[in-house]
A protein has these predicted regions:
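N-terminal activation segment of mature serine protease catalytic domains
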Residues: 28-87, 91-92, 103-104, 128, ...
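Active-site region of chymotrypsin-like
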Residues: 43, 135-145, 174-227, 232-235, ...
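Conserved active-site neighborhood of the chymotrypsin/trypsin-like protease fold
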Residues: 49, 74-77, 86-174, 197, ...
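Gly/Ser-enriched beta-turn/beta-hairpin loop segments
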Residues: 55-59, 122-127, 182-197, 248-251, ...
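PDZ domains, with a preference for the canonical peptide-binding region formed by the helix
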Residues: 98, 235-236, 304-343, 468-497
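C-terminal, low-ordered peptide segments at domain boundaries
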Residues: 140-150, 313-314, 320, 341-422, ...
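C-terminal subregion of chymotrypsin/trypsin-like serine protease catalytic domains
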Residues: 214-254, 500-531
Length: 531
């Protein structure tokens, strides 16, 4: 005879039901696709960048497709009225990579097949964000701005289930699900910016500018997706960008002012009088912008930022995301303009410095990082093409430029400070951190020599770093034209940094003007200078 143990049977059925219902309990509600289908704004950009090897020409046009999100600028009583943006009107938000160097931006609504032309209102290339406007009022009919919500970390209920859109065809859309891997600090190499970024798995068919959804709320914007993973900008950064866009004078996002490392060896700790067992990070370079640029020195040992102690690997305990790199403080806890205390060891003494949270700036470097929306700067004299060393120029060596570009040029970028050319140049560079970008010294090159009878014998010269012209030190491109106005003899003399193919060259003063005109006509160069 079979005997039933009713408590056991009841317990068993309870466990089975719980097991069957568990996926439904844990899985977040899938967002409805219809509202997004009606509100969707598709973006197509036609982009044509400059050819930095032949700076008066442009490269072939390429196209990209993605999305743009309808937004309204947040209203703040403390912000001044902006000249370029209006808080009461709607704008489109997308990535800067989608619109950089665009000759045409074509925007389409799913319910209106007619394309509209968009224009860039504001672009922050370092943060990879851009704001667009469309003048035709018909485009904005029935469109509503997105209501943003902060993204939740994985430990919170249903927080791991996130969604974005997948466009299979013009009429066939679906929602694609994924999971938050972590909130990381990403390095945007083209601008050397360290910013918060969400790393996702499972989402691979979305694109730039697509919304990121969690618990049926919009919590971010997709940066890139593919091969089963994606990256997204969280809401907090997007709202900060929009808030800055609505201010009287735009500032980029909050950023640190230094590069850092662990103490490389015990002798370094001894030299800088740092207790090696004390948690913290070693400041090995101070940038001319960002939080702490006014108070920090190279060699400082930073132990605490505000109320957050630093570990040896530069991590803090974030209240939402746990152990993270300290840059994550700028996501939601530290905003531009906030007062901030920095605790550190300097020359063996523990000190506290007061500063304010400051924003990223683009041009505070000897070698400017990638620039978009601006034509290359150049000067042509006697066929010698003078340009400033930039990341755009180095990128002309292709995707592997970090190993293919000339080593002596790459060193300037990797250190982002000049090789010691002479004592006078060193002094100028040391002062540049506290000066505006117009006075910052640059590395000026003769990138190539355009053939003409005046420069026979010099035509193989390339990538030569200019020290002086006619005895005048060259620290920026505009110095070149000024120096050519003041020859010391009947010849112009150009001196180069040792290591170039030549240490110096000469060009006759007589005939230089005629040579410039021949070169302009023969090579169809629109103008001989651009800066």
């Amino acid at each position: 005879m079979i005997k039933f143990n009713f408590p056991s049977v009841i317990l068993g059925w309870t466990l089975i039901c719980a097991f069957l219902l568990l996926p439904q309990v844990l899985k977040a509600e899938v967002p409805a696709i219809k509202p997004w289908f009606k509100q969707a704004v598709l973006l197509k950009s036609y982009q044509q960048s400059y050819d930095w090897l032949t700076p008066w020409e442009k490269r072939e046009i390429r196209t990209q497709t993605g999305m743009a999100l309808v937004v309204r600028l947040p209203v703040s009583e403390n912000t001044e009225s902006a000249e370029t943006v209006d808080k009461q009107v709607l704008y489109l938000l997308t990535t800067a990579e989608m619109v950089a160097d665009a000759t045409l931006l074509e925007v389409t609504r799913k319910d209106i097949r007619q394309p509209f032309q968009a224009k860039i209102v504001l672009m922050d290339y370092a943060a990879n964000l851009a704001l667009l406007n469309i003048e035709d009022s018909n485009f904005w009919d029935s469109l509503n701005p997105i209501d943003w919500s902060p993204v939740k970390s994985k430990p919170k209920a249903d927080a791991g289930n996130i969604y974005s859109l997948n466009i299979k065809s013009v009429q066939e859309w679906e929602v694609q699900s994924g999971t938050i891997q972590l909130m990381a600090v990403g390095h945007r190499r083209v601008s050397d910016a360290w910013l918060a970024v969400l790393k996702l798995s499972g989402i691979s068919k979305s694109g730039q500018g697509f919304p990121l959804l969690q618990d049926n709320e919009t919590v971010g914007m997709i940066l890139e997706a593919g091969k089963g993973e994606a990256k997204a900008i969280p809401t907090q950064m997007l709202l900060e960008f929009l808030a800055h866009a609505g201010s009287g004078s735009y500032k980029s996002l909050a950023h640190r002012c230094f590069s850092w490392s662990r103490l490389p060896q015990r002798s370094t700790a001894d030299f800088f009088q740092i207790p090696p067992e004390l948690p913290g990070i070693w400041v090995n370079r101070v940038l001319p912008y960002g939080t702490g640029s006014d108070v920090l020195h190279r060699g400082d040992y930073l132990t605490k930022i505000g109320e957050w102690p630093l570990s040896h690997d530069g991590k803090i305990k974030h209240p939402e995301w746990g152990r993270s790199l300290f840059d994550l403080l700028f996501l939601d806890l530290l905003k531009v303009g906030d007062s901030l205390d920095l605790e550190l060891i300097r020359e063996g003494k523990a000190i506290v410095l007061q500063t304010r949270v400051s924003a990223y700036e683009e041009d505070g470097r000897t070698v400017p990082l990638k620039r978009v929306g601006h034509p290359p700067r150049y000067v042509i004299q006697g066929g010698f093409l003078f340009q400033e060393l930039t990341l755009n120029y180095l990128s002309m060596w292709g995707a592997n430029w970090r190993s293919r570009a000339p080593v002596r040029l790459r060193l300037f970028l990797e250190q982002n400070k000049t090789v010691l050319m002479d004592d006078n140049y060193k002094n100028v560079q040391g002062e540049s951190a506290s000066q505006n970008t117009e006075s910052a010294p640059r590395v000026v090159l003769v990138t190539q020599v355009i053939p003409d009878e005046i420069n026979i014998g010099y035509q193989k010269l390339s990538n030569a770093i200019v020290l002086r012209i006619n005895g005048q030190r060259i620290r920026r491109l505009k110095d070149v034209d000024e120096a050519f106005l003041n020859p010391e003899t009947e010849f112009h003399r150009i001196d180069f940094l040792p290591g170039s193919d030549r240490l110096s060259v000469i060009l006759p003063v007589a005939g230089l003007k005629q040579s410039n005109q021949r070169i302009k006509n023969n090579f169809r160069i629109p103008k001989l200078q651009s800066y």
